[in-house]
């Protein structure tokens, strides 16, 4: 007989989860900082989104639309989708959690990749299932490695495309091959948080695969190119059976009215989105060229961030660079937890921030 408990105890596995640690926002003793650690857009949200958000403030006593119809319809209109296949949530993180809650349990396995988004592992373990990590090949998802890891216990596969923190992507032909090789009951989750930034002819965010299959879902976010990270707005495109299952456990009012209004206005303002994408493309090229010229190695990125690898020598490692940059007010993201102990991830920021990092790293790399 087990000993009597004298306090509440979480179910097995919960205390084995390493809590997610966001990118830092402040540096002690530094008045002005440039936060380049969370992949936020330097252009901010669309003025139309701000206007819609402000207008919603006059009705805060009213519950929001539990179906988020205005937002779902806006997404459907912009992408040419059926509104019945769209589910919105309090950030795509909530939707990923719902998927795990509904489709995973004790004894199940879910496959993640070596450098994948840390939230996947947290949600999988939170559902009582076991995460199975597969190696990537040169910072790119290896489809053959994923297929080789499938067992009778596999119920879900998570794939960030583009990847975070690598910024690399998997061509649509490889995604199709992955889906075709998975058992039909295994859910393939395509996390396309950075899809709007990709300018590659062989990339497809997931709309096509979801439309033609019953076991594929795609998640997207308004936290990146749309500049609504503070409001927590995400959406999912999935088969109606999966949408129905998630709706059965989803909170009845899981999104605020201001978030719904701002999201709908933001996605309809595609002209503003293109400004953000153009700014990113311009500075991505400049930053990569400059950093490479300094002797740094950069992982090719199609997103809005750059993974910068530092020399393995005293005074020049990523930890040294992080401290050097932080003292000057430039906050990049340490990515040791993603398997890159000697790299930093930099968000493509404003012109002022980008030029500042260039100057700081030029000084850093030139030190004796």
From Swiss-Prot:
E.C. no: 2.6.1.9
Biological processes, Gene Ontology terms: L-histidine biosynthetic process
The keyword Transferase is assigned to this record: yes
Cofactor: pyridoxal 5'-phosphate
Pathway as given in its UniProt record: Amino-acid biosynthesis; L-histidine biosynthesis; L-histidine from 5-phospho-alpha-D-ribose 1-diphosphate: step 7/9
InterPro entries (UniProt xref): Aminotransferase_I/II_large (IPR004839), HisP_aminotrans (IPR005861), HistidinolP_aminotransfase (IPR050106), PyrdxlP-dep_Trfase (IPR015424), PyrdxlP-dep_Trfase_major (IPR015421), PyrdxlP-dep_Trfase_small (IPR015422)
Presence of the UniProt keyword Amino-acid biosynthesis in the record: yes
Top-level class of the enzyme under EC nomenclature: transferase
Catalytic activity: L-histidinol phosphate + 2-oxoglutarate = 3-(imidazol-4-yl)-2-oxopropyl phosphate + L-glutamate
Keywords on record: Amino-acid biosynthesis, Aminotransferase, Histidine biosynthesis, Pyridoxal phosphate, Transferase
Alphabetical list of Pfam families matching this protein: Aminotran_1_2
GO molecular-function terms, A-Z: histidinol-phosphate transaminase activity; pyridoxal phosphate binding
Modified residues (N6-(pyridoxal phosphate)lysine): 224
Sequence similarity: Belongs to the class-II pyridoxal-phosphate-dependent aminotransferase family. Histidinol-phosphate aminotransferase subfamily.
Subunit description: Homodimer.
PANTHER family the UniProt entry points to: HISTIDINOL-PHOSPHATE AMINOTRANSFERASE, HISTIDINOL-PHOSPHATE AMINOTRANSFERASE 2
UniProt name for this protein: Histidinol-phosphate aminotransferase
Name of encoding gene: hisC
């Amino acid at each position: 007989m087990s000993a009597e408990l004298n306090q509440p105890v979480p179910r097995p596995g919960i205390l084995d989860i390493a809590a997610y640690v966001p990118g830092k926002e402040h540096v002690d003793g530094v008045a002005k900082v440039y936060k380049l650690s969370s992949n936020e857009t330097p252009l901010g949200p669309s003025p139309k989104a701000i206007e819609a958000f402000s207008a919603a403030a006059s009705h805060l006593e009213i519950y929001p639309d539990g179906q988020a119809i205005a937002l779902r319809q806006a997404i459907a209109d912009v992408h040419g989708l059926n509104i019945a296949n769209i589910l919105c949530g309090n950030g795509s993180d909530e939707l990923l959690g719902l998927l795990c809650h509904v489709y995973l349990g004790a004894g199940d396995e879910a496959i993640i990749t070596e450098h994948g988004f840390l939230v996947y592992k947290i949600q999988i373990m939170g559902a009582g299932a076991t995460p199975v990590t597969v190696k990537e090949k040169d910072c790119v998802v290896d489809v053959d490695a994923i297929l080789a890891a499938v067992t009778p216990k596999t119920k879900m596969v998570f794939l960030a495309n583009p990847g975070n923190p690598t910024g690399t992507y998997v061509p649509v032909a490889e995604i199709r091959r992955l889906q075709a090789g998975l058992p039909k009951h295994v859910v393939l989750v395509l996390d396309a948080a950075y899809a709007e930034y990709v300018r590659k002819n062989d990339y497809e965010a997931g709309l096509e695969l979801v439309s033609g299959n019953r076991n594929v879902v795609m998640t997207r976010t308004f936290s990146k190119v749309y500049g609504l990270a503070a409001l927590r707005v995400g959406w999912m495109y999935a088969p109606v059976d999966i949408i129905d299952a998630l709706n059965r456990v989803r909170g009845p009012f899981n999104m605020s009215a201001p978030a719904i209004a701002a999201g709908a206005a933001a996605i309809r303002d595609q002209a503003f989105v293109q400004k953000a994408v153009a700014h990113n493309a311009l500075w991505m090229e400049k930053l990569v060229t400059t950093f490479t010229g300094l002797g740094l190695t950069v992982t090719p990125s199609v997103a809005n961030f750059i993974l910068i690898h530092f020399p393995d020598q005293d005074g020049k490692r990523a930890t040294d660079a992080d401290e050097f940059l932080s003292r000057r007010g430039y906050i990049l993201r340490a990515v040791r937890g993603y398997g890159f102990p000697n790299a930093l991830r930099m968000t493509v920021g404003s012109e002022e921030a980008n030029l500042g990092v260039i100057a700081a790293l030029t000084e850093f790399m030139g030190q004796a």
